[in-house]
Amino acid sequence: MTEKVITRRGFIKLGIVAGLAVAASATIGLPVYEKLFLKQVPPEKIKAIKERIRRGGVQVKYTACVMCAAECALEVWVKDGRVVRIYGNPHLTYNSGGAACAKAVSGLQLQYSPYRIQYPLKRVGERGEGKFIRISWDQAIDEIAKKLVEIKKKYGPEALLTDTGDVTDRDQYWRLTFAFGSPNAVEHGAICDTPRRHGPKLIVNGKRWEPDILRPVPVRMPDGSIQWYNKHDAKLIIYVGWNPFTATRIVWENIGTVRAKAENGCKVYVIDPGFSNTATLADKWFPIRAGTDADLFAAMLRYILEHDNPQDPNRQYINYEVIEKYVEGWSEFLEAFKSWWDKIDPVTGKKYFTLEWAEARTGLPREDIEKLAHEFGVMKPAALIWGMQSPGHHYNGYVASILGCVLNIITGNFEIPGGVIDTEIVKSSKGGTATGKQFNKRKVKRIINGVEVEAEQEKLHYAWYGDWPAAWDDVVGDLPRMIMEGITLKYGPFRGHKYPIAAYILRTGNTLVTAGPVYKFIEAFMAKNPDGTYKLELFVYIDTIFLESGLYADYVLPEASYLERMSLSDIYPTHPIIFLRDAVVEPLFEAKKPTEIMNMLAKKIYEYEMKEFGRSDIDPKEFWEKYKTEEDFVNEMLQVAPGRPNVGRPLPFPNQPEGYILYGTPESLDEGRVVIDHEKKVVRGEPVTVEYLRKHYGGTMWPMSWYRYREWDAEKNDWKSGGIITTKTKKLELKFHKYETYNKLVEEAGVIPLSWKVLGWEKLPLTFYWFETVWNYYTNPEYAKYREEYPFQLICARVHHAMSGTQMCEWLAQTPAEGLWIPLSEQFELKMAETIPGGKEIVNVAKSLPKNTWCIGTAQINRVDAEKYGIKTGDLIVLENPLGRKAVAKAYVCETVRPGVIRIGFATGGRFSPGLGGTYYHRLYTPNHSELVDYKLSPIMGQPCFADMIVKVRKTTIEEAVNMLPEYYRIQFRIEGVGTI
Amino acid sequence: MVELAESRFIKLQEELPRLFNRWIEKKSANPRWVMVIDLTRCVGCYSCQASCKMENGVPYEYFRTHVEVIERGTYPNVRRVFLPRLCNHCDNPSCVPVCPVGATYKREDGIVVVDYERCIGCGYCVQACPYGARYSNPETGTVDKCDYCLHKLSDGEVPACVSNCMGGARIFGDVNDPESPVSKVLSSKAVATLKPETGNDPRVYYVGLEEATKIGPGEAIVINPKVGGVIRT
Amino acid sequence: MSEEENLPNLSEKEYISLLLFRAQIYSILRNIFLFEPSREYLNNLLQDRFLNKIIEVYPEKCLRDSASDFLEAVMEILRGGENALIDTWAEYTRLFIGPGPPATPPYESLWIDEHEARRYKGEAWLKVRDWLLDEGLILESQTILEDHAGIEFEYMMVSTIKAVEMLEKNDRTGFINILIKQKKFLEEHLITWIIKLCDAIEQKSHSSFYKSFARFTKYFIKEDEDLLKQILNNL
C-alpha cells in the first residue's frame, strides 16, 4: 500500500469514480437479493400518512349517530378495524359545532356490547319462552322467504306488515315490502307523537315547529358570497312539554337555547309538570297540570284576541298583514273559536278559554297565564314550542297542536329570524325512488264478495282503508286488536276485503314495550287459532341488540350496527343539510347490512314465487342486480337532495329562478352547472353522492333563508303565498283542506270511523275544534269518579337514553337525570363493555358492582305527597291504575315535580330482556311505564295515549312486588349468543 | 368538475372548528393551561364525564371528571344545578409533596401530572387531594388523574371533555394568550374557584358558582355518580 | 483529521463523480448494517476494486487504513470457508439483533443522551421518520424502524443519487438543496450517534470485520461532513 498523498481534487480528477459503476440508478453496489427499504411516494399519500400518524395510526371517519333520534354528525376514530373514539363532527353545524353527548360516546359500549346478537336465531318452544337455537343465514332467509310466499298465497301479500321501528334508515325494508306487494310498511312515527305534528301538517303540510336557534347558518350575502350568520335573534322561547336538554331529539336546541339566552338575552319559559333539565336554565318554570296544554293555549289565544290593540305598542300582538295575505280560513276559525266563549265548562263552571277557566284547569295562577299570553304577544321574535310527551301523547293533543300553530302564526313569528321554523318542509329530501313507494301504484286485483276489483296496491293499506282513514302516519298502537281480529277494509275501492296480519317483520323496534300496554301485545303475539297455530304466523325480529319484542319472535336476525352500515341521517335543521352515515368498521359476528338482508330476502322470495306462481312481484333488476353495494342504494336516495324551492330572503341561489325546486350539490347550483326545466319548474345540478359527501367531511348544506312561505311574483310585482307551503291553496290553511280527502273517503263508504263517532263527529271539522283528553278528572267530567281513589296523574319523561335500546350502555348508567334515573341499584354482577387503560379499545369483562352505582328507573314524587304516605327516597312503592295494572318502583322524593303528579322515565325500568345488560338485573324493582298505559288510541291518528293515566300509590316490599308483577319479569332468560362472550 | 379544494362550501366547513374553539390555534412560548366551567351553560348531559372515560380508559367505578346534580328550594321555587368537577391543577397542590417517590409534579405549563413509571400506587396523593380528583387504578397499579388530555394537546386539540361539551360550558386554553377563549372569559365574567380555603390555589374557574352553591332555605339534594345514591344535606 | 485544503470549483462531471463516490460508500455502509454479509457480497467487495482504490489513493489516512483493515478482514473470511462466514453472521446477530438486548443496537433513539428518549421509537426515531416523510419517503418494513443506521445510510445513498439526477437534468438548485439537506441530516442525526455506535462496536466486537468496518464508518461520516461543508461553500 503506497502512501500517496494527493489532494481531493486530484483524487476526483483521477477519474477513479468515473471508472466505477456510473449508472445513476439505484443499483449502485447493491447485492442482487436486496431491494431498497425506502420508497418514494406522491405528496398526497404523504399528506394522508402524516394525518394518520398525527392521530396515532388512526383513521378519521365521518358518520352519524343513532343513539337517539337526533342522529348527530360524528367524527369517529378507527384503529385496527375497531372504533376507538367518538367525537362530534366539527365541520357540520347540526350538533352544537361538533359536540357529542354521553349517549354518542357510549355508542362504543353498544357497538362492543357483550349483549349484541351474534348470529341468526330460530325459536324453539313457545313464543315468550326465550328459547332459541343458532341457525345459518341461508337457513333463516330460506325459511322466512318460504313462509312469506306461503302467506302471500293464502291471504295476499298485504298480510305482511313491516314495522321498521325506531331507527330511521329503513328504506331497504320498505322497498322490499312494497315490491312484495304489501303497502303496509310502518315505522316509529306512528307511535311517536302524531298529535304533536297535527297542526303543522294541516296548516303548512309540515311537521315539527322549532325555534330558529340553529346557529351558525350559511346565508347568501349581497355580494354573492356565503357567510356564517352566527347571531341569535330569539327574544322569547316557551317550551311546553318539551325538554331539549335531556330529550335531545332536535339537538341544536340544546346549545341554541343556552346561546340565545347568553348572547341575545332571550327569555326562556318552561311549562311542564316536572322541573326538567331545560327548566334549570329557564327564567321561570310553570308547573302545569298534565294534559292541559290545549287549555293553556286556548286561554292564551283568547287573551291575545281580546287584548290586541294595534294602536298600543304594548299590545301589538297580532300581525294582520301575515293573516291577510298568507292565511286561509282565519275568519271561520275565529268564529268557531269564539263560539265557545260564552259556553260554561261543566268541570270548572267557568266560561271556556277565560283566564279563570284556564287557572282552574291548568292549575297555574291566572297571573301566570296572563303573563305568558301577554309576553308571547308583545315580545318579538318569539317561539311557542310544544312537545312529544305533551301534548303529543295526549288524546286531545291535536287541539293543542293546532292552537300552538295559530298562536305562532297570528303573532307573526312563523319563518322569521328568531321565530318558529317548520323543519319538515325546509330540510333536505332523501329517499326518492329507493324507498320503492312507486311499487304501491301498481294495479292489483282482488275478489270481494264475488266481484273482481282492480285498483292501486296502496288502496289495500291496513289503516288508511281500514279503521283509520285519516291516520297518515299509520297506526301501530292498534296492532294487538288488528292481529286478533284481522283487517277488514272499510274505505276505498277495496272495501269489504278482509285479510289477517299474518306476518310481522319488526326491525330496530320494540313495539312490545314502546307501543302501548305490554300485556296487550303479548296477548296478540301469543294468540292462537283453534288448530293451535299462532294467529300471527310469522314474526321476524331484526336488530343489533336483543330487546323484549325479540322474545316473541320466530326468527331473530342480527343487523349491522349503525357504525357498520351506510345510510343517511334523518335530521331536522332549519335549512337543508344532509350528512352520511358511513360504515366505518366491518360488521361484527354474523351481522349483515340492511342492503344485504334486503337482497337476500328479495332473491329467495323471487325464487319461491317463481316456483309457486310462475312469476314474481320481485324484479331482480330492482334489487340485487341494481344494488350491488349499500353505496348504490344510498346514491339513489341522494338523488332527490335537497328537493326544496329556491325561496326566502336572502335568496339562497340568486342565479337560479326563484321558486323552482332545487336538486344537486350546492357547488353545481352555485356555479350554474345545471339543467333547468321551466315546465316542471325544476333546477337540476350535479347529484349529491356518497363520494361527494365523504370529500365534504361527511355532509353538506344549502343556504338558509327566512320568509320562505312567500315567493316574489314578478308579474304582479308583489309577494304571493307559496314557496315551502305546499298545501292545497299554497297558503297557511286554517281551513283544513287536508281533511277533505278523508271526509270524502268516509262519505263514499258511508261508515264513520269509531274514533270519530266517539267524539260525536260524522266527519272531520274543517276549522277550529275542541274536545277533552281522557283519564283526566281536571278536564273531563267522565273521570271525576276516579279522583279520590287515584289521586296522581302519571306521566312519562326522558332521561339520557333514547328509544328503548340503549339501556345496556354502562356509561349511561352514570348519568342521573331529573329524579327519574337515579343511582339506587342493588349490588349485582354483570358482563360489561369496559375500556382499558389508555382508552385503547373496549373489551368485555365481568364485574360486580356495589349498591348505588348503577342508575335505575325511579318514580318521582313530590315531598308533600310522599309525606302523606310515609314514603322516603329509596322506598319501594307500587303504582296501580284503575285497570288494575301495576308497576313497582323506588321512590325519588323531591320538590321538582308538581304535587299530584308522578313521573317515570321512558324505558328505564322493568326491562325484561337480557339484551339490556346491566339494566336487566334491576327489572323487579323498577317501573315499566307501558304496564300502566291504557289501550286507548287518540282519534284521527290512532296514537297511544301514553300521557293520559292516573294511579294510586302505596308502599310495598320486594317480596310482594315480585309476586304482583307478571311472570315475564321473574323468568331469568338466557338467549343463545346474547351475553355469552 | 371544479376542484373541490376550491369549493366555497368546503371552506365554510373548515372555518367551523375555529368558530367553536375546537382547536388550540396559537401557542404562546410559555402556555399556561387553564379551564373555565361556565355553569350558566352546563345542560347536565354528562358528555364530559363519559368522553373522558372513553378518551383516557377510565374504569367504570372511577372518574377523572364527573358531574354532580344539586337540587335546592321548595316547590315551586326550585333550582337544579349541574356541577362538573375535575382536578383543579392547583398552583399549590397538596398532592405533590406527599408523594414518596416524586412521581407527581406540576409542569411549567400548569398541568399536574403523574409519572406512571415512577408511581408505586401507594395512594397518599389520593387522600391528600381535597377535591377527590385522583383515584387508584387497579388495572395499572398506579394512581390516575386528569392531565388535560396531554396526548391531544400536543396535537393542538382540546381535551375530549371540552370538544364534546354540548352547551359549550367547558372553556379551555392558554391563559397567557390574551386572545384565547379562557382569557376572554376571565376578563369578561366573574369567576370563582372551589374550596379556595384549602390554600391549594386551584386553577379551574367557575362562572356562576355562587349561584350554584348558595346555601338557601330548605335542604339540598345532591346526586353524585361517583358516590352513588341520593345525598341530602 | 481533515486536510486544510479547500475543495476548488469542480466541473459538472466532477461533481457527479464525487456524488457517485459518496453513494457507493453509503451503499456499503447501508448493506453491512442491514444484512449479514453473503459470500457473494464479500466477493463483490473484493472484485469491483472500489475499496482498493480508496486504499491506494484517498487523501485521508484514517480512511485508507481502516479500508485496508476492512478489506483484509473480508479476505480472511473468504479464506476461512463456511465457518468463518457463519461466525460473522453470528457476530452480526449478537451486535445488532439479540437474543436479549443486542450488544450495540443500531437505533439512533437508543444512543441519544436525554434519558427519557432512551428507548425504541423515541424522540430521535420520530424526528427521522418525519424527516423521511418530508422527503416523500416511507419505510416499507415490518421488522425495522426508520432510525436504524442502515436506513439512515440508505437515505443518504438514495438522496445522493437523486442529486446526481438533478445535476444531469441541469437542476442546479435541486442539487444544492439536496446537499444542504444531507448536511443537516448528518449534523442533526448521523454525527450525533454513529460515532458513539462505532466506538462501541469497536470495543465490543470480537470480529476484525466489524471492528474495522466500524472504524471505516466513523471516519467516513466525519469526512463526509467535511466534504459537504466544502462543496457547499463553493456553490
Named regions from a protein language model:
Chain A
Residues 2-312, 336, 450, 505-507, ...:
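N-terminal export/assembly segments and adjacent metallocofactor-ligating motifs
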Residues 165-166, 376, 420-431, 615-635:
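A glycine-rich phosphate-binding loop feature that marks nucleotide/adenosyl-phosphate handling sites
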Residues 173-260, 264-269, 295, 405-551, ...:
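Extended redox/cofactor-interaction regions of prokaryotic respiratory oxidoreductases
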Residues 265, 269, 274-379:
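Long, well-ordered, tryptophan-enriched scaffold segments
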Residues 277, 548-580:
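Flexible glycine/proline-rich, aromatic-decorated loop/lid segments
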Residues 282-287, 577-587:
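Short beta-alpha connecting loops at secondary-structure transitions
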Residues 394, 594-656, 665-666, 812-981:
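Long, contiguous, secondary-structure-rich segments that constitute the structural scaffold
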Residues 537-538, 583-602:
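Phosphate/diphosphate-binding loops
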